[in-house]
């Protein structure tokens, strides 16, 4: 699924992050990337997602060389990335609306995707993530756990085949964090997603990277 060959990447100040790094992730596998702050964990996710490009070497996902963001790759961040002026429902539907403009490959407008179908998909994920009762609320009106559930629903509504998660539960309280960790395991079992999770805790790495 993920093939990293001879990856070299430096920060703008010249600091070397990766030098000739190679890695393989098979379809359906779950990996946890563990390490201290500043060691390049998030940078690795951004490189796999196509948000940054290597100085040398190449990254392939699903057999395709990554030269730009890949529509089938889902990325969930610690900061949620929600639009504060949009409701929970609108935030969950955002990816589907963008796909309606640019198409599944991110470059070609589709022949047509029924608005009704998008609404049904959005509602299904609101139900699955337990968000239906706050669907009309804004991000500032709901809890951190609900905001992260919204981000997860928005990403998974697009049916990605690769899910990248950058310390998604680090800012949550312990009960909410455990709840969302278990939810992630359930969703992975249901979908067979290939998953890479960045974390700074050994316990979370052991749980989500197994």
Where are these regions (language model features)?
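ABC family nucleotide-binding domain
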Residues: 1-192, 196-197, 201-202, 208
């Amino acid at each position: 699924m993920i093939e990293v060959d001879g990856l070299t990447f430096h920060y703008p100040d010249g600091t070397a992050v990766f030098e000739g790094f190679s890695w393989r992730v098979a379809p359906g596998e779950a990996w946890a990337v563990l390490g201290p702050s500043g060691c390049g964990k998030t940078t690795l996710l951004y490189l796999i997602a196509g948000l940054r490009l290597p100085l040398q070497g190449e990254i392939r996902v699903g057999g395709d060389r990554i030269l730009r963001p890949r529509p089938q790759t889902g990325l969930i961040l610690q900061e949620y990335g929600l639009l504060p002026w949009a409701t929970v429902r609108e935030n969950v539907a955002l990816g589907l609306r963008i796909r309606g403009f640019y198409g599944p490959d991110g470059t070609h407008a589709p022949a047509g995707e029924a608005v009704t179908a998008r609404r049904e998909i959005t509602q299904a994920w609101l139900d699955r993530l337990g968000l239906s009762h706050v669907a009309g609320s804004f991000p500032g009106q709901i809890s951190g756990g609900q905001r992260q559930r919204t981000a997860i629903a928005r990403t998974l509504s697009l049916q990605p085949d690769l899910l990248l998660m950058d310390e998604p539960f680090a800012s949550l309280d312990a009960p909410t964090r455990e709840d969302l960790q278990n939810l992630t395991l359930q969703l992975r079992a249901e979908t067979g997603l290939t998953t890479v999770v960045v974390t700074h805790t050994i316990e979370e790495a052991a749980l989500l990277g197994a």
